[in-house]
Amino acid sequence: DAEGALYENVAQTEPTDPAGGTLWVDGKVLKRWDGTSSMWISVPTVYTKISCTDIGKSFSEGDGVTLAGIAYTGDSETVKAEYAALNASKVIQKKGDNWIVVVGLVSRNAAQTGGLTVKREAPEMDYICQAQNRLWGCRYGVKDGKAVNEVYGCKLGDFKNWTCYAGLSTDSWAAQVGSDGAWTGAVNYQGYPTFFKENVLHRISVSGAGAHRVTDTPCRGVQKGSWRSLCVVNEVLYYKGRTEICAYDGSVPVAVSAELGDERYSEAVAGGYGRKYYISMKNSSGAYELLVYDAARGLWHKEDNAQAIMFAAADDDLFYIDAATNRLVAANGTQGTREGDVEWSVVSGIMGYEYPDHKYLSRFDLRLQMRGEANLYLQYDSSGQWHYAGRLLWKKGTTRSFAMPVIPRRCDHVQLKLSGKGEMRLFSIARILELGSDM
């Protein structure tokens, strides 16, 4: 029975004059004679006890295991089939150090020497995330000669059990998916285990009753090799797609990297702190860049050329491992030696003019807060050549206006570039124009 007690005196043929409690194996069903109703009653669940030295030491009751190597060496083909049926996935009902009990019917006891294996296995998985007190994973490939394209969930609260199927809401779970291609990443987003391929995402709706459901959304997914770019910043999920960086809020992903131009990046690794998304990527020339996206302002900044192996947020800072030095770097400088003033540059968009006449600039009025120095450059009519236009120097770190006169030059449009070293915050730019003729 379920406690491991042996059923005694089980008849192989129907007794002619049974007493109450008499047992009889009718084919594959164990029956008990009910003296009150004078009829045979099927025993709903029959158990088999397997005894072997230390067989139960490594397991717990409720574990899902796979049995193999069980065989009956007698002459009865019926009993051989009963023993062979035990070679399957089972749930341990009871256990001791030297025995386990599983669901199964054998009509005769037998002993064998060697060959028996009991395994508790986790499936091979490409990516894993945690959600709703379970681990969830995915796998695309070939297993035992068969194509595999599946998602998995472990038993509730038990990461060791992935094949425990007892008909309960806490059981392990697995499902096949129909989308093509390899998995490229996984993340817990808004409580949903979310799995990505390059052109689709699959989201699992976790059910308290165990009836979990998979939905798929054809969209820009995670680029192959950029699974570490998945990161939540201000409740929005950011990641590196094949051609752009995407933001996903639970509906459909949108691109946020138009300002980075047509450069193709790969092997992205990212982390988040506050409202900022830090991402280290390899560009098309093979060099790495560390870029920062300010989600609140929609601005991109290039920090430096660091290659980050991975990011982790802790102690009110964001840390990453620098691949060049294998050192831990605090992005916000709360630990270690703070770096000195950094060089910076900012380039405006194309600034056109509202008047039909050819115009020329007489000066720029810049309102900024600065502690350091900056140089001003101008580019006329998208010529590709930057012309030096002046230098700013202000060490106090307060806000003030600077009038920057420029040599008059007629043009259709102009771009401005500021570069310098130290602290700088730009509030406004005013252009002072002089009008000329159409000639």
Task: Kindly label every feature range from the protein language model.
Residues 27, 68-69, 138:
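Residue-level recognition of conserved beta-strand edge/terminus positions
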Residues 221-236, 242-439:
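Beta-sheet repeat architectures centered on beta-propellers
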Residues 7, 29-36, 143-167, 290-298, ...:
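Short beta-strand segments and strand-loop junctions that repeat across beta-rich extracellular domains
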Residues 1, 38-40, 47, 211-216, ...:
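Tryptophan-centered short beta-strand motifs
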Residues 121-272, 301-304:
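Beta-propeller and closely related beta-pinwheel folds
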Residues 56-60, 198, 369-374:
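Short proline/glycine-enriched turn/loop motifs at strand-loop junctions of beta-rich domains
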Residues 2-30, 36-45, 260-268:
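Extracellular/surface-exposed low-complexity repeats and stalk/linker segments enriched in Gly/Pro
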Residues 2-4, 22, 38-123:
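Small/polar beta-strand repeat architecture
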